[in-house]
C-alpha cells in the first residue's frame, strides 16, 4: 500500500467520523450521509462535483447514478479514457436532505477534506462540475459564463477546467448537452496527451478506502 493510499484512507476515516454540520449530526434521512472520494490515487485528473445523491450514500461511491453514467460516456467517447484513470470526489461529502443545495456552513465544514484530497493526489488538472465546485476553486459564480475555459486556482496552485454538471436535468437540454460535449473536446485539445494514463490503479485496500467504481 503506497503512502497516498494510506493518507486517503486516514482522511476518509476522519470524514466518516465528522460531526461539523447538522447533516453529519443526524439531520438527514439516511443513516450514514458521508461519501468520500475514490479512484486512482495517482490520477492526473481529479473530478469534483457538488455533493453525493441518495444512491451514492448506499453504495458509498461518488457519481454512481445517472449523472455518473453521463460523465463516463463523455470520458470514454471524447477523452478516450476510463474512470479507473481518474479520481472523483465532491465539494460536500454528505448527502443533503432532499438533495437541496448545500449551505455555506456545510461547504465550510467540508472544505478541509477536499483540500487535503487534492494535496494528496496531486493531479495535473481539476475538472469542476457545476456551480458549487466552480466557486470553491475559483470564487466565480455562473457556470454559463465560465465553462470550457481553463483557469488557474491561486489557492490550490492548480489548473481548473469548469464544466456543466452531467445531471439528467442538464443533459436533457440539447443546448447544454452540446456545450458539455464541446467542452470535453476543448479539454482534450488543451491536454494534448499531457494527462497520463497511470498504471498504478487503487483497488479496495481493505482498510476503508473505496476502490474503483
Which ranges hold each PLM region?
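The first long alpha-helix at the start of the GST-like C-terminal all-alpha domain
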Residues: 65-86
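Active-site and ligand/interface coordination hotspots across diverse enzymes
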Residues: 1-66, 77, 156, 193, ...
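Glycine/proline-rich loop-helix segments at beta-alpha junctions forming the active-site rim
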Residues: 2-5, 26, 83-84, 91-213
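Short amphipathic alpha-helical segment that frequently serves as the phosphate-/nucleotide-binding helix
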Residues: 61-69, 177, 181
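Short, flexible, glycine/charge-rich loop motifs used to bind or transfer phosphoryl groups or to couple energy/partner
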Residues: 34-38, 76-77, 116-117, 148-151
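N-terminal catalytic or cofactor-binding beta/alpha core of small enzyme domains
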Residues: 44, 86-88
Amino acid at each position: 500500500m503506497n503512502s497516498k493510499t494510506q493518507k486517503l484512507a486516514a482522511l476518509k476515516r476522519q470524514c466518516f467520523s465528522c460531526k461539523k454540520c447538522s447533516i453529519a449530526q443526524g439531520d438527514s434521512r439516511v443513516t450514514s450521509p458521508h461519501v468520500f472520494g475514490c479512484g486512482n490515487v495517482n490520477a492526473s485528473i481529479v473530478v469534483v462535483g457538488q455533493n453525493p445523491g441518495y444512491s451514492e450514500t448506499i453504495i458509498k461511491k461518488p457519481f454512481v447514478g445517472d449523472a455518473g453514467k453521463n460523465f463516463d460516456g463523455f470520458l470514454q467517447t471524447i477523452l478516450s479514457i476510463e474512470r479507473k484513470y481518474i479520481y472523483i470526489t465532491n465539494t460536500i461529502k454528505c448527502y443533503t436532505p432532499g438533495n437541496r443545495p448545500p449551505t455555506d456552513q456545510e461547504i465550510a465544514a467540508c472544505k478541509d477534506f477536499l483540500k487535503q484530497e487534492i494535496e494528496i493526489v496531486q493531479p495535473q488538472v481539476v475538472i469542476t462540475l457545476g456551480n458549487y465546485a466552480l466557486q470553491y476553486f475559483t470564487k466565480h459564480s455562473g457556470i454559463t459564463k465560465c465553462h470550457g475555459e481553463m483557469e488557474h486556482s491561486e489557492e490550490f496552485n492548480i489548473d481548473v477546467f469548469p464544466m456543466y454538471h452531467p445531471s439528467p436535468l442538464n443533459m436533457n437540454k440539447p443546448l447544454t448537452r452540446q456545450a458539455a460535449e464541446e467542452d470535453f473536446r476543448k479539454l482534450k485539445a488543451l491536454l494534448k496527451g499531457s494527462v497520463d494514463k497511470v498504471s498504478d490503479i487503487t483497488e479496495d485496500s481493505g482498510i476503508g478506502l473505496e476502490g474503483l467504481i
